[in-house]
Amino acid sequence: MSKVITFSEDARTHILKGVNTLANAVKVTLGPKGRNVVIDKSFGSPLITKDGVTVAKEIELENKFENMGAQMVKEVASKTNDEAGDGTTTATVLAQAIYREGAKLVSAGHNPMSIKRGIDKAVGIIIEELKSMSKPVKGSNEVAQVGAISANNDKEIGQMLADAMDKVGREGVITIEESKTAKTEVTVVEGMQFDRGYLSPYFVTNAERMEAVLENAYVLVYDKKISSMKDMIGILEGVAKQGRQLLIIAEDVEGEALATLVVNKLRGTLHIAAVKAPGFGDRRKAMLEDIAILTGAKVISEDVGLKLEAATVADLGVAKRIVVDKDNTTIIDGAGKKNDINGRVGQIKAQIEETSSDYDKEKLKERLAKLAGGVAVIHVGAPSEVEMKEKKHRVEDALNATRAAVEEGIVAGGGTALLRASTKIDKSKFSEEEQFGATIIKRACEEPIRQIAANAGLDGAIVLDRILQNKSTTWGFNAYSDEYTDLIKDGVIDPVKVVRCALTNAASVSSLMLTTETMIAEAPKKESAAPAMPGHDGMGGMGGMM
């Protein structure tokens, strides 16, 4: 396959065109007065969104060289989304500004490698300054403000996230699902819930709700199948003598064992329920261990030399309340020791730090939440499917922003923190060529404010000038109310993690693009002309006709 190669000035021009095309489509969404983008879908109704990364992911350009520039900026948005979950539009605006200013200097003959070193140094200075400006999140009010800003000033969403975080704690898991109604609401699952229901509907105690509810019940945790009743006689007799209730969690309960449990339940001899163990393979073993620690049970497992027939009531755990429906089991207020639970939480946190797999991280965080707090589900509803999808995007952004804020703290929003932090560049020393890179970053840090102002129908230069007249680091422009004010008091705040990731990723990709001198792409395929048909005047086979 033949290739097309382009060099130096031509290459940079192509990259800049691609960068500008993508960034111009994305940056209209920035700020409280940013606009929506409508995206055509190959099936279903068009998607309306104000989420930068969603817009960026849809863009593919026809010209291969320009597309390379666009794809590299798309990488900036995606990486920022993966790390911080928000700030994708800011990252795109910064990447465009850094590359645009840098390309001018490289074209004028400056050394791109020295400019890159200057950019990297300046970014390091700004990040240190952002950390020193950071304020920890205090109380649910600030959590609600962060959520509202990321959800395009939707205070209802912000408050909902703050309430959910209050209920499940900062370690808890908050998930977002589409609602079947037009209402958006939060439901909280207290205690530990796993996705396994009762093995027989005969275990149900509440026929109206189709639930088996056990109060002050023992919990048996076993890692193998239970087929024979004789293995369980000892435990069942011990539980029956005390007149207590019992939940059996095992790989499976089948045949004679299940039939005997059902008969005893129907006769009223035993108040009992049985469910399958959650998860698969190694994850199942870990989750059974979690349940055992939460309830104060021992995992009955031959791996540790415990057999079911030798188990006694002392090996069982206890929970104040257990609710089992056809799909889920919820264990509330287990009797596990606080120290054991904290030790297990610490162990899972260490595993989260060590693992590099996003899937494993997600599953470990779910286990952590079930042990440490609980799970909150936000059901997003709206009158139409199009609006519901747009709202779901905003809720996801808001959730990610609030988590980031809790992690690393907050700074003044509206692009102000970057502008204030960039003033530190003037007080730092750079070599002559590196100074150009530092100047590029200083100029790029003004760009988010300029764009927020432009989207609000104002002149960015005038807004910048007004902000810089006041030396307070929290003083800035509130585009929602069109006022110059103390942004933190007004609740216009950004998570430090979001601002940091946006700048780091934008500078990383843009400075690499500046050092590009050659571009190679596949040559477009030439359309081959259709072969002429045999015969005279293209009418072969018809010569005998008059």
From Swiss-Prot:
GO MF term list: ATP binding; ATP-dependent protein folding chaperone; isomerase activity; unfolded protein binding
Record keywords, A-Z: ATP-binding, Chaperone, Cytoplasm, Isomerase, Nucleotide-binding
Enzyme Commission number: 5.6.1.7
GO biological process: protein refolding
Catalyzed chemical reaction(s): ATP + H2O + a folded polypeptide = ADP + phosphate + an unfolded polypeptide
Pfam family, one: Cpn60_TCP1
Top-rank EC class of the record's enzyme: isomerase
CC annotations in GO: cytoplasm
Subunit and interaction comment: Forms a cylinder of 14 subunits composed of two heptameric rings stacked back-to-back. Interacts with the co-chaperonin GroES.
Family the entry assigns: Belongs to the chaperonin (HSP60) family.
Protein name according to UniProt: Chaperonin GroEL
Annotated source species: Bdellovibrio bacteriovorus (strain ATCC 15356 / DSM 50701 / NCIMB 9529 / HD100)
